[in-house]
């Protein structure tokens, strides 16, 4: 590993430990040339995943897009930023396990909806309204009915 101060490539590892909930290894190193101590992180390199969009075009999987979309759905809820990151990490893990390098955007959307339904009902409704392109109150009502199993009459009296 190259020293950040003298650029020497000889270093020794002083300490190693698991980091990022087991997804990486944190190593404390010391340069054999200048004795500067620095930290490195090692993680498994994953194969790039291609997302097949609705129009048939492809783009590389971008975790940041998921974080942004889910963050919008979770605004003003009890879902913390850390919870969002952990949620997106779990979605990414499912995608990596389930796909061979290609996944449809609709499959990603359904994974997110399935997870949000368990985690936070408000975020689920918000995400579903954008993902499924709700056109009016009826779309919200039918989603609320499926979420709670309520009858139309009960919801109509509330609205």
Curated annotation (Swiss-Prot):
This is Transcriptional repressor NrdR. Pfam families: ATP-cone, Zn_ribbon_NrdR. Binds 1 zinc ion. GO terms for biological process: negative regulation of DNA-templated transcription. PROSITE patterns: ATP_CONE. Residues 49-139 form the ATP-cone domain. A zinc finger (unnamed) spans 3-34. It comes from Prochlorococcus marinus subsp. pastoris (strain CCMP1986 / NIES-2087 / MED4). Negatively regulates transcription of bacterial ribonucleotide reductase nrd genes and operons by binding to NrdR-boxes. Its cofactor is Zn(2+). Keywords: ATP-binding, DNA-binding, Metal-binding, Nucleotide-binding, Repressor, Transcription, Transcription regulation, Zinc, Zinc-finger. Belongs to the NrdR family. GO terms for molecular function: ATP binding; DNA binding; zinc ion binding. The keyword Zinc-finger applies.
């Amino acid at each position: 590993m190259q020293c950040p101060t003298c650029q020497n490539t000889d270093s020794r590892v002083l300490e190693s430990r698991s980091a990022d909930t087991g997804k990486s290894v944190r190593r404390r190193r010391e340069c054999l040339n200048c004795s500067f101590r620095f930290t490195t992180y090692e993680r498994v390199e994953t194969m790039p995943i291609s997302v097949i969009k609705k129009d048939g075009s492809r783009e590389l999987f971008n975790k940041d897009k998921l974080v942004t979309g889910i963050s919008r759905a979770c605004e003003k809820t009890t879902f913390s930023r850390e919870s969002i990151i952990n949620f997106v990490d779990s979605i990414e893990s499912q995608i990596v396990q389930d796909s061979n390098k290609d996944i449809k955007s609709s499959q990603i959307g359904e994974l997110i909806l399935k997870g949000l339904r368990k985690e936070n009902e408000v975020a689920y409704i918000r995400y579903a309204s954008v993902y499924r392109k709700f056109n009016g109150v009826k779309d919200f009502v039918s989603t609320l009915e499926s979420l709670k199993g309520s009858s139309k009459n009960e919801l109509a009296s509330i609205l």
